[in-house]
Design a protein with these regions (language model features):
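Conserved ATP-binding/catalytic motifs of P-loop helicase motor domains
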Residues: 1-207
Length: 207
């Protein structure tokens, strides 16, 4: 309804190929949910998955707790970390120039132990493309300068630091162009604890 849409007449493109799922029945169910056209049959399929008295077995299975509140997620992750007997290692972000705390993509301080369940929070910027945002794994080796994660597909990844950029955009109305300038960076290992995550962080992930 914005005026800019009426003036620009944008071209709308619908993405209609699903890459993350291959089960046609599941894809159809997801489409019904997306289009608010859920049938009684599809609802019955979903309800079969509901187990009201379910209790995950501690450390035995790769269950992830989803919560609407960061405080609950942090409490669960802290509790699970404390239960691990391994030595803890702490890693600090490197922040250069202008990068306000409100823009931090993750905590400035990352503490890990061998056995910690983690999630990558950025796509691998190297040519190998070993991980992507949302990929899950377990920390299998740590040192002061290295982090090794074994992912759910058994791929072993030596994690390197990634850099997020704070980009300032300026427009040149005379030339009808937009210029970009990197005014700050945030560099850290792109991992977060993942025994529990917020529903917001889980959006778009496949478990």
């Amino acid at each position: 309804q914005a005026q800019v849409f009426r003036e620009l007449h944008p071209v709308y493109i619908e993405l209609d190929h699903v890459f993350r799922q291959t089960n046609s029945e599941f894809i159809e169910l997801l489409n019904q949910v997306r289009n608010n056209s859920l049938t009684a049959q599809a609802l019955a399929v979903l309800n079969k998955r509901y187990i009201p008295d379910f209790e995950p077995t501690r450390q035995a299975d790769n269950y992830i707790t989803l919560s609407t509140h960061n405080s609950k997620v942090d409490a669960i992750n802290r509790r699970e970390m404390e239960a691990l007997k391994a030595k803890s290692y702490t890693y600090h972000a490197t922040i250069k120039n202008t990068f306000p705390e409100s823009m931090f993509p993750m905590d400035q301080v990352l503490t890990l132990k061998v056995g910690a369940r983690v999630m990558f929070i950025k796509n691998d910027s190297s040519q190998e493309k070993l991980y992507y945002n949302g990929k899950l794994g377990v920390v299998t080796a740590l040192s002061k300068t290295t982090i090794t994660v074994t992912c759910e597909d058994d791929m072993v990844v030596e994690v390197h630091s990634e850099t997020w950029e704070n980009i300032r955009y300026t427009s040149d109305t005379g030339a009808d162009t937009i210029a970009s300038e990197v005014i700050g960076t945030f560099t850290h290992y792109p991992l977060r604890l993942a025994w529990a995550i917020t529903i917001h962080k889980a959006q778009g992930l496949t478990f």
